[in-house]
């Protein structure tokens, strides 16, 4: 592989992934893209994640394994893979998700035809057995053709609005030369929402982002998924990262982009307060819940929506 040009590097950050990794990596190896490599980064897993990866390596030399000495989260794992990658394009794949076989060929061919630095496609939620769950993530937007997304469009879809199909869940395919030339890396302080900040940074430094409406990424929906409910500590980290982003690009962000970031921050602050209040109620700490909502009344509406949504999901089971 070292003597051949590698078209794509598929990055799989893995933690406690021994039960799901094989299917994910096999979907990566099945990509009809020619020369590729799959880099699995074992994020100091306490299980057999590394062993499962070595079993895959024994069957297919395109699989590579990196191991981290201590758990650093998905950002640290992906950054390690970016440094080691040889592909012209970088594709992010979670260790319990899959891709349709033609996904990367379609996305990279399109990206090269328009000069994109990053391309998204839609994702299809599936159950742990790979069965589709409803419509695709962005089906309600009724996008029928490729779209170029400037930073304002991207931020519009990442405001943490109740019921919003957030663009931050989409998985990017990135031009590695642009990533390296601009020093783009995942924020290792984030355990949630790290993809948003990478793409926001790419756009802020002049990168070109396109969206393809075909759902080629299969997102596994699991109870207790980290992206299902937001830990208040993670929300605070996101707010800090948002403020740092705006400060870095204060001279280049448009007035509309700054307005959207302020709205995003208000919504995340509401979400964090609502989560704190819900946890307090569940623990029987009603005074703490009341105090949290009195300090941020706008979070009360968010809390009641979350409770109503949780009850609706229970009735549906």
Give the positions of each predicted feature:
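Nucleotide-sugar donor-binding/catalytic module of glycosyltransferases
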Residues: 1-233, 311-314
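C-terminal subregions of glycosyltransferases and related glycan-biosynthesis enzymes
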Residues: 3, 197, 204, 209-317
């Amino acid at each position: 592989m070292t003597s051949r040009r590698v078209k794509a590097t598929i990055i799989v950050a893995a933690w406690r992934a021994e039960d799901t990794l094989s299917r994910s990596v096999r979907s990566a190896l099945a990509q009809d893209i020619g020369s590729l490599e799959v880099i699995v980064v074992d994020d100091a897993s306490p299980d057999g994640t590394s062993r499962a990866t070595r079993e895959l390596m024994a069957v297919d030399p395109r699989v590579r394994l990196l191991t981290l000495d201590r758990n650093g989260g998905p950002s640290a794992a992906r950054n390690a893979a970016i440094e080691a990658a040889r592909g012209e394009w970088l594709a992010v794949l979670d260790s319990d998700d899959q891709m349709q076989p033609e996904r990367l060929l379609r996305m990279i061919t399109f990206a090269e035809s328009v000069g994109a630095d990053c391309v998204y496609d839609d994702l299809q939620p599936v159950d742990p057995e790979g069965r589709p769950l409803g419509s695709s993530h962005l089906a309600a937007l009724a996008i029928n053709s490729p779209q170029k997304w400037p930073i304002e469009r991207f931020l519009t879809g990442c405001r943490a609005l109740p019921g919003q199909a957030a663009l931050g869940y989409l998985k990017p395919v990135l031009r590695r030369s642009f990533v390296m030339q601009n020093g783009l890396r995942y924020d290792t302080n984030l355990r949630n929402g790290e993809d948003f900040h990478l793409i926001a940074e790419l756009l802020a430094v002049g990168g070109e982002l396109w969206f393809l409406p075909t759902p080629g990424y299969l997102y596994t929906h699991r109870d207790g998924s980290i992206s299902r409910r937001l830990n208040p500590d993670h929300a605070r980290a996101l707010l800090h990262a948002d403020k740092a982003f705006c400060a870095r690009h204060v001279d280049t962000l448009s007035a509309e982009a700054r307005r959207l970031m302020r709205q995003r921050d208000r919504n995340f602050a509401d979400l964090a307060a609502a989560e704190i209040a819900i946890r307090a109620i569940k623990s029987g700490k009603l005074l703490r819940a009341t105090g949290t909502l009195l300090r941020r009344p706008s979070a009360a509406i968010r809390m009641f929506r979350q409770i109503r949504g949780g009850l609706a999901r229970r009735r549906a089971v």
